């Protein structure tokens, strides 16, 4: 059987790419009052993180200090370090630069596409992974830049509810992930983790900002998950 290459990887990423274009348009339209299309393009090229870019735009809107923006992006994207570590185990014999290239463009969705491919095969060609990553990368870049250009033509983009686009996407992801987790993790443990996140969030709101409360509550929830797992 012929080994799958770059174009097969790009084809496998088409559902992700289409989703990135739509979410990218929403991100660009929302960010239009605060950044130019060129600035948004540079943000997408060098940051390339949907949730982090939405957070950046929210912080830019309130004129938050650069240090706060950088720390927020770092914490939001920290999970990608773990995803890259795991993905690299399937490319042990690939060169360092190839692995750096794959890890630099890895996202939650392209990682999911990789895991889906590995469910049907034991080995993935690095070029397949580059196709998977690059198709999604270009789609996000195009979506955000076009969205920013269009946003400048809309007097009040909030009326379209586009600011809820990423939230809606994550609700869908969480719902599907919750169903999968139920098969491996007892429901009572999931409820304990949710309780820790909820209670700690409202307690933290009394001493820190909302954005920091979300981040710290998430870290506490992760800690609770590790303790309950016992590993």
Task: Report residues per predicted region.
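Membrane-embedded alpha-helical modules
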Residues: 126-216, 223, 227
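Helix-loop-helix junctions within the multi-pass membrane cores of secondary transporters/permeases
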Residues: 71-163
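Alpha-helical transmembrane segments and their helix-entry boundary regions
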Residues: 40-43, 54, 69-70, 97-101, ...
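Juxtamembrane membrane-interface segments at transmembrane alpha-helix termini
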Residues: 52-60, 81-88, 173-180, 206-207, ...
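Hydrophobic, membrane-facing alpha-helical anchors
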Residues: 18-24, 51, 107-121, 159-176
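Intrinsically disordered, low-complexity non-transmembrane regions of multi-pass membrane transporters
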Residues: 1-9, 123, 184-185, 230-231
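Helix-loop-helix hairpins and the membrane-proximal interhelical loops
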Residues: 1-49, 56-73
């Amino acid at each position: 059987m012929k080994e799958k290459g770059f174009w097969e990887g790009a084809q496998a990423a088409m559902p992700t790419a289409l989703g990135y274009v739509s979410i990218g348009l929403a991100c660009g339209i929302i960010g239009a009052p605060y950044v130019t299309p060129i600035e948004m393009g540079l943000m997408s090229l060098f940051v390339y993180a949907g949730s982090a870019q939405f957070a950046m735009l929210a912080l830019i809107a309130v004129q938050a200090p650069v240090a706060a923006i950088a720390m927020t992006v770092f914490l939001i994207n920290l999970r990608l370090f773990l995803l890259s570590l795991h993905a690299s185990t399937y490319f042990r014999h690939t060169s360092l630069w190839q692995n750096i290239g794959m890890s630099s463009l890895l996202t939650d969705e392209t990682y999911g596409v990789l895991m889906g491919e590995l469910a049907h095969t034991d080995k993935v060609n690095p070029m397949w992974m580059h196709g998977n990553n690059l198709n999604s990368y270009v789609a996000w870049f195009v979506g955000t830049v076009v969205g920013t250009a269009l946003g400048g033509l809309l007097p009040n983009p909030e009326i379209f509810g586009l600011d809820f686009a990423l939230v809606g996407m994550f609700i869908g992801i969480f719902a599907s992930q919750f169903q999968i987790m139920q098969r491996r993790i007892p429901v009572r443990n999931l409820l304990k983790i949710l309780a820790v996140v909820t209670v700690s969030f409202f307690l933290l709101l009394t001493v820190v900002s909302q954005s920091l409360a979300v981040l710290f509550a998430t870290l506490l929830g992760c800690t609770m998950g590790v303790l309950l797992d016992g590993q």
